[in-house]
Curated annotation (Swiss-Prot):
The modification Phosphoserine is found at S60. There is a cross-link at K287 (Glycyl lysine isopeptide (Lys-Gly) (interchain with G-Cter in SUMO1)). It holds the Pfam family IQ. GO terms for biological process: actin filament bundle assembly; actin filament organization; actin filament-based movement; endocytosis; post-Golgi vesicle-mediated transport. GO terms for cellular component: actin cytoskeleton; actin filament; brush border; cell periphery; cytoplasm; early endosome; endosome membrane; extracellular exosome. The lineage of its organism: Eukaryota, Metazoa, Chordata, Craniata, Vertebrata. This is Unconventional myosin-Ib.
Length: 1136
């Protein structure tokens, strides 16, 4: 019997209604009740056609396990109960199999679960796509980008402990197999005002608390931070700790994620240094100080914080202090410097902190994009995931809410357009007559905001750029003049009389009728936030930082690239970003996730109907259902429809052998459903009213009950017959076993009797044999005993004889030993006597010889005594000298000049020689500590000392700086891959220098490369080689004696490289570059390179000899030397 495959459906075991399109009747109350019923049963997902509604459960649910992923993998969208995995799988399969770019739009208010929804989408796609080391690395980098962005872009709010304070759009790129290749992240409207001020009960961005909680003491000391939150004005104290959040563990997670994404250690440390600088900026406080002209000037109260900030960022303290006290306004050739009062100084401080953090966040996004972007250039498929603010209506709505709601208006507009477009395309594709759908078109609201002439954003930009006094009130007056007659704009001060007595509309506000309802905006702060003004002095101060990251964040601060053009406003930038986003979304197939927050307490099992109703209205969910139901409420392919309802018709049950459409037609005709309630498309059947579908479900449920009864009847009959046959078979078996048992029992009794008789007979025979054996044994034992007694008597006799013989032998031995001892003692006595006589003779002879010698040499004793005493004394003095020198040895440092003094004059030469030998020895010991690389560094430093010491004023500042050579890391930076491939030799120097234009003295950035044989110049942006000079053609290097980085490279006349003339450069690493060029040229050409140090020298520019003259510059022009071509024969360099 063939096994029947059971196919599930969305309608099986449905709690409430799984698809709101099928809700009957459809109104706000039934919509909310259906959501609540499903929420109470932990069903947090509900469909509106292909749109997923997600209600935040505020608890963990067991519906995201790997088993669930496999359950929804490659399944039809309506085959299982509603789930975010179903939408993710549908989008992924459409991208992989149909080659359609996809986008998933996730919207909802803060705390509704948008960020978690985006993570679930990404984790599902990562789980179902291909495997492999490279693919897994890409997936891991894409997933680990989330913790980094959350740390820097999320914060605790009253609505959400992990609220995204920026909009994020990620394009995930796939190859033709559906494997991820990389991604690109775009961010929108970071809430940077949170950096300097947070509402009560909320926190600053997570990274500040994570850094202070999780960083080691060593790192905190390096960043000049303390672990106490109360030490920093930018951190709110009432919500510093969040229940269930471990900031220290999260910090370790973020550091690990940064490493996985591709951040190098020095990059991560640079980022944390910027975060620390932002924190410490909030601790700078100002006090007023009166000037002679009567105006107040701001002064910093405590300069310790400023000093630590400058040490972190590498900015000169006086430069930053001046930027907080003065503001310079430039207009063409004029500069005007004005003092800042205390309020302006605080504004400048906060503006700097906000700009520094927001630019750092943008840099982080770009840096992550560099790591996760696809490296291959093959054609890619794209899935975009949009996680952005939902519609916001607060008690106080400002510029941020206005911009956010504008973005949501655009998203609502594209949602309605794409939904209608999708409906229309399906009707046309299925050859169904198209029914026009009436809906509210919010294009008029979008035009009110974004119109280039009369739009609110355009008028706000116009007001910001207008000369004269510009305030929020003047902006509101302009709105009242232009927008008064607009049907979606309301203002108390407008010409429209119907709002003059509206007390709910304050004079300083205006109201817009959005698609989600009316929103009242406070006009205060609109102009200031739109300007987003950062004083030029602060930008220039940041650009002067030695901290490379901070310097790169403020390119407009470069004095060489002064741009007097006003930067674009925040509103215009966001408008352009939204336009780009909308254009991008329109090229993709949309998928929607609408997130809803069930309560404001962030608690599980609580469903606030009023709050949910508010969200349903501004998300336009009822409008969405009505659009879906305007034509046909339900549509389904013929095959699953016939499979589900075939039991309702005898002709189609149990199997239909024709086409599926014919079977559905037969089925519906049999059920007598009115023809106006359904329509047959090319591949689907369309049902107009949900009641028809529910009728089909009721009939199916009744039929299933009937079929269940039939199956039970047949099963019970089969069970009874099977039981009877089993009992009959058992009776036969039992009878056979009983007969066998009776025969076996009778046989056992007979066998037992025979065994008993046999055992008695065998016992009698055995006892008889035992008696005979015992008698024989006793006889043998008696014979043995007699023989033993006789042998014992014989042995005792022999023992007595042997003992007597042994006693006689012992007596003889004792007598012999006593005799030998007496003989030995007599011989010993004789030998001792003879030895005493010999000793006496020797002593007498020695005494006689001594007497004889003393008599002969007595006359010499006194003369020799003095000489011996002198030699002994001299030897003792030298010995004592060496012992004292051993204890007084100086340190092993070669630069230690100390040496013990000598005690006696005659030791002078020895003392000096010993000092020389000791110095040579300790120098050798010091040199032996160095590695070959360190020796090379010291050789270069020694070479630099010989070339520039006491000759070049810049030299002392270079002593403490290590020579690095490859500052650009060309081998690691993919930007310079083309340049790296073009150079086959070892790169000795890779540095960005300023090349001085021969014609006008202006500078251009070039990459300066020195290899073993050549000197090369390359374009900084493209990496293309512009000039290549063999080292044999370099004849001389000229520079001034002053504290500047200008130098000239002279080329051999007539060489190909010298066609345009000598080169003139400016570099921050002049000493290192000149030293390495000198050593490389010497190694290559075996000739010393001429180094000329003079404040005037000649260079060859084409056919002209030009004098380069160094003069004292004006301090007002800053600390950077300037170069100017005076005439055809003179080029002046002004050094401050």
């Amino acid at each position: 019997m063939a096994k029947m495959e059971v196919k599930t459906s969305l309608l099986d075991n449905m709690i409430g209604v799984g698809d709101m399109v099928l809700l009957e009747p459809l109104n706000e109350e039934t919509f909310i009740n259906n959501l609540k019923k499903r929420f109470d049963h932990s069903e947090i997902y509900t469909y509106i056609g292909s749109v997923v509604i997600s209600v935040n459960p505020y608890r963990s649910l067991p519906i995201y396990s790997p088993e669930k992923v496999e359950e929804y993998r490659n399944r039809n969208f309506y085959e299982l109960s509603p789930h975010i995995f179903a939408l993710s799988d549908e989008a992924y399969r459409s991208l992989r199999d149909q080659d359609k770019d996809q986008c998933i739009l996730i919207t909802g208010e803060s705390g509704a679960g948008k960020t978690e929804a985006s993570k679930l989408v990404m984790s599902y796609v990562a789980a179902v796509c291909g495997k492999g080391a490279e693919v897994n690395q890409v997936k891991e980098q894409l997933l680990q980008s989330n913790p980094v962005l959350e740390a820097f872009g999320n914060a605790k709010t009253v609505r959400n402990d992990n609220s995204s304070r920026f909009g994020k759009y990620m394009d995930i790129e796939f190859d033709f197999k559906g494997d991820p290749l990389g991604g690109v992240i775009s961010n929108y409207l970071l809430e940077k005002s949170r950096v300097v001020k947070q509402p009560r009960g909320e926190r600053n961005f997570h990274v500040f608390y994570q850094l202070l909680s999780g960083a080691s003491e060593e790192l905190l000391n390096k960043l000049k931070l303390e672990r106490d939150f109360s030490r920093y004005n930018y951190l709110s104290l009432d919500s510093a700790k969040v229940n269930g959040v471990d900031d220290a563990a999260n910090f370790r997670t973020v550091r690990n994620a940064m490493q996985i994404v591709g951040f190098m250690d020095h990059e991560a440390e640079s980022v944390l240094a910027v975060v620390a600088a932002v924190l410490k900026l909030g601790n700078i406080e100002f006090k007023p100080e009166s000037r002679v002209n009567g105006l107040d000037e701001s002064k910093i109260k405590d300069k310790n914080e400023l000093k630590e900030i400058c040490e972190l960022t590498g900015i000169d303290q006086s430069v930053l202090e001046r930027a907080f006290s003065f503001r310079t306004v430039e207009a063409k050739q004029e500069k005007v410097s004005t003092t800042l009062n205390v309020a302006q100084a605080y504004y400048a401080r906060d503006a700097l902190a906000k700009n520094l953090y927001s630019r750092l966040f943008s840099w982080l996004v770009n840096r992550i994009n560099e790591s996760i972007k696809a490296q291959t250039k093959v054609r890619k498929k794209v899935m975009g995931v949009l996680d952005i603010y939902g519609f916001e209506i607060f008690e106080d709505n400002s510029f941020e809410q206005f911009i956010i709601n504008y973005c949501n208006e655009k998203l609502q507009q594209i949602f309605i357009e794409l939904t209608l477009k999708e409906e229309q395309e399906e009707y046309i594709r299925e050859d169904i007559e198209w029914t026009h759908i009436d809906y509210f078109n919010n294009a008029i609201i979008c035009d009110l905001i974004e119109n280039n002439t009369n739009g609110i954003l355009a008028m706000l930009d116009e007001e910001c750029l207008r000369p004269g006094t510009v305030t929020d009130e003047t902006f509101l007056e302009k709105l009242n003049q232009v927008c008064a007659t607009h049907q979606h704009f309301e203002s108390r001060m407008s010409k429209c009389s119907r709002f003059l007595n509206d007390t709910s509309l304050p004079h300083s506000c205006f109201r817009i009728q959005h698609y989600a309802g009316k929103v009242l905006y406070q006009v205060e702060g609109f102009v200031d936030k739109n300007n987003d003004l950062l004083y030029r002095d602060l930008s220039q101060a940041m650009w002067k930082a030695s901290h490379a990251l901070i310097k790169s964040l403020f390119p407009e601060g470069n004095p060489a690239k002064i741009n007097l053009k006003r930067p674009p406003t925040a509103g215009s930038q966001f408008k352009a970003s939204v336009a780009t986003l909308m254009k991008n979304l329109q090229t993709k197939n949309p998928n929607y996730i609408r997130c809803i927050k069930p309560n404001d307490k962030k608690a599980a099992h609580i469903f606030n109907e009023a709050l949910v109703c508010h969200q349903i209205r501004y998300l336009g969910l009822l409008e969405n259902v009505r659009v879906r139901r305007a034509g046909y409420a339900f549509r389904q392919a013929y095959e699953p429809c016939l499979e589900r309802y075939k039991m309702l018709c005898k002709q189609t049950w149990p199997h239909w052998k024709g086409p599926a459409r014919s079977g559905v037609e037969v089925l519906f005709n049999e059920l007598e459903i009115p023809v106006e309630e359904y329509s047959f498309g090319r591949s689907k059947i369309f049902i107009r009213n949900p009641r028809t579908l529910f009728k089909l479900e009721d009939l199916r449920k009744q039929r299933l009950e009937d079929l269940a009864t039939l199956i039970q009847k047949i099963y019970r009959g089969w069970k009874c017959r099977t039981h009877f046959l089993l009992m009959k078979k058992s009776q036969i078996v039992i009878a056979a076993w009983y007969r066998r048992y009776a025969q076996q029992k009778r046989y056992q009794q007979t066998k037992s009797s025979a065994l008993v008789i046999q055992s008695y007979i065998r016992g009698w025979k055995a006892r008889k044999i035992l008696r005979e054996l015992k008698h024989q044994k006793r006889c043998k034992e008696a014979v043995t005993t007699i023989a033993a007694y006789w042998h014992g008597t014989q042995a005792r006799r022999e023992l007595r004889r042997l003992k007597e013989e042994a006693r006689n032998k012992h007596a003889i031995a004792v007598i012999w030993a006593y005799w030998l001892g007496s003989k030995a003692r007599r011989e010993l006595k004789r030998l001792k006597e003879e030895a005493r006589r010999k000793h006496a003779v020797a002593v007498i002879w020695a005494y006689w010889l001594g007497l004889k010698v003393r008599r002969e040499y007595r006359k010499f004793f006194r003369a020799n005594a003095g000489k011996k005493i002198y030699e002994f004394t001299l030897q003792r003095i030298v010995q004592k000298y060496f012992l004292e020198m051993k204890n007084k040895m100086p340190s092993l440092s070669p630069i230690d000049k100390n040496w013990p003094s000598r005690p006696y004059l005659f030791l002078d030469s020895t003392h000096k020689e010993l000092k020389r030998i000791f110095h040579l020895w300790r120098c050798k010991k010091y040199r032996d500590q160095f590695t070959d690389q360190q020796k090379l560094i010291y050789e270069e430093k020694l070479e630099a000392s010989e070339l520039f010491k006491d000759k070049k004023a810049l030299y002392p500042s270079s002593v403490g700086q290590p020579f690095q050579g490859a500052y650009l890391e060309i081998n690691k930076n993919p930007k310079y891959k083309k340049l790296k491939d073009a150079i086959e030799e070892k790169i000795i120097i890779a540095e960005v220098v300023n090349k001085i234009n021969r014609a006008n003295g202006k500078s251009t950035s070039r990459i300066f490369l020195l290899t073993n044989n050549n000197l090369l110049l390359a374009d900084q942006k493209s990496g293309q080689i512009k000039s290549e000079v063999p080292l044999v053609d370099v004849t001389k290097v000229s520079m001034s004696s002053q504290n500047d980085g200008f130098f000239a490279v002279h080329l051999k006349e007539g060489s190909e490289a010298a066609s345009k003339g000598d080169f003139l450069f400016s570099s921050d690493h002049l000493i290192e570059m000149a030293t390495k060029l000198y050593r490389t040229t010497l190694s290559q050409t075996k000739q010393k390179l001429n180094i000329e140090i003079s404040d005037e020298f000649l260079v060859q520019f084409r056919q002209d000899k030009v004098c380069v003259k160094f003069i004292q510059g004006n301090q007002k022009n800053g600390s950077v030397p300037t170069c100017k071509r005076k005439n055809n024969r003179l080029l002046e360099v002004a050094v401050p």
